[in-house]
A protein has these predicted regions:
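Local sequence-structure signature of Cys/Sec-based thiol-disulfide redox active-site neighborhoods
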Residues: 10-44
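A short, hydrophobic beta-strand/beta-hairpin element that forms part of a small beta-sheet core
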Residues: 78-85
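Thiol-based oxidoreductase modules, predominantly thioredoxin-like and allied folds used
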Residues: 24, 48-64
Length: 85
């Protein structure tokens, strides 16, 4: 299982070697839980293709909002963001 990241800064994301897959998840949302479970079914393949960052949007809402702002995307949950180069 992937571990949750408590601190993330877009300027420190290194996506040169492989893309970074940011998964924003809420454990209070059944749709988010289903989405995370589907991603976990493909965990081995995803780990080969990308560096995976998992964010709990309930526990780390401020970081989740900051990340959305830095990347210029709307804050959603569930949400998958791919950062490449």
């Amino acid at each position: 299982m992937w571990s949750y990241t408590n601190d993330i800064d877009v300027s420190n994301i290194d996506s040169e070697a492989k893309p970074v897959l940011i998964i924003k998840h809420s454990n209070r949302c059944s749709i988010s839980s289903v989405a995370l479970n589907r991603l976990l079914e493909s965990q081995a393949e995803l780990d080969q293709r990308a560096r995976v960052i998992l964010i709990d949007v309930i526990a780390n809402r401020s970081n989740s909002l900051l990340l959305a702002s830095q990347l210029g995307v709307d804050h959603e949950s569930p949400q998958v963001i791919i950062v490449k180069n």
